[in-house]
C-alpha cells in the first residue's frame, strides 16, 4: 500500500511538471531566454495568435504532419512520437543556434531557421499550442507576429 502511494505521488509530480512546461508563461520563458542571450527584447503572449495556433494544431491532430499552415504568422512546428513539452519544443528550435552564422547571415552545417524565428527582433507577439495526435504523438506549433525570417535580413 505504501509503495502505491509513492508511485501515485511521483505520477502526480510528473504530471504537474508536464503541465507546467506547457503554460503560456513557459513558452514565453523559453523564447525570451534565447532572445536575451542575443540582446533581443522579450515577446509577450497574444491570445489572438494563440487562438490561431490552437485552431491549426487541432486541424493537424489526425495526421500530425509537419506542414506549415500558410497563415499570416511566422511559425515553428515540432512533432514527437512520445509526449513533448512546449518548453522542450522551443529548446529543440533554440538548439539550432550553432548552425546560424551571423556574419554571413546563413545556416552553416544544418538547419537554423527555427532558431532565427525564435530570436527575430521584430516578432514580439507569441501564441503556441500543443495537441495529442490521434496516433499518440505530440504536435506543437508556435506562431509569431509579425513573422520573421525575411530573406537578406538579419534576425537581430
What is the meaning of each model-derived region?
Residues 73, 83-156:
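Disulfide-stabilized extracellular recognition modules
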Residues 65-68, 78, 115-119:
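A structural signal for short loop-to-beta-strand junctions that line the ligand-binding cleft
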Residues 19-74:
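Short, well-ordered surface patches within globular domains
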Residues 1-4, 155-156:
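A positional/structural detector of protein chain ends, strongest at the extreme C-terminus
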Residues 54-58, 79, 91, 95:
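Generic alpha-helical structural context detector
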Residues 3-20:
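Cleavable N-terminal signal peptides of Sec/SRP-targeted secreted and luminal proteins
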Amino acid at each position: 500500500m505504501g509503495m502505491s502511494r509513492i508511485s501515485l505521488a511521483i505520477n502526480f509530480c510528473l504530471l504537474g511538471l508536464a503541465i507546467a512546461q506547457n503554460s503560456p508563461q513557459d513558452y514565453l520563458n523559453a523564447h525570451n531566454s534565447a532572445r536575451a542571450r542575443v540582446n533581443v527584447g522579450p515577446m509577450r503572449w497574444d491570445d489572438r495568435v494563440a487562438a490561431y495556433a490552437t485552431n491549426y494544431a487541432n486541424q493537424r491532430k489526425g495526421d500530425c504532419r509537419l506542414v506549415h499552415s500558410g497563415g499570416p504568422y511566422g511559425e515553428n512546428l515540432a512533432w514527437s512520437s512520445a509526449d513533448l513539452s512546449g518548453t522542450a519544443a522551443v529548446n529543440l528550435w533554440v538548439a539550432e543556434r550553432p548552425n546560424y552564422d551571423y556574419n554571413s547571415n546563413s545556416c552553416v552545417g544544418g538547419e537554423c531557421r527555427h532558431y532565427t524565428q525564435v530570436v527575430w527582433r521584430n516578432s514580439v507577439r507569441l501564441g503556441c499550442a500543443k495537441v495529442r495526435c490521434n496516433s499518440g504523438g505530440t504536435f506543437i506549433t508556435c506562431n509569431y507576429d509579425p513573422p520573421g525570417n525575411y530573406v537578406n535580413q538579419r534576425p537581430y
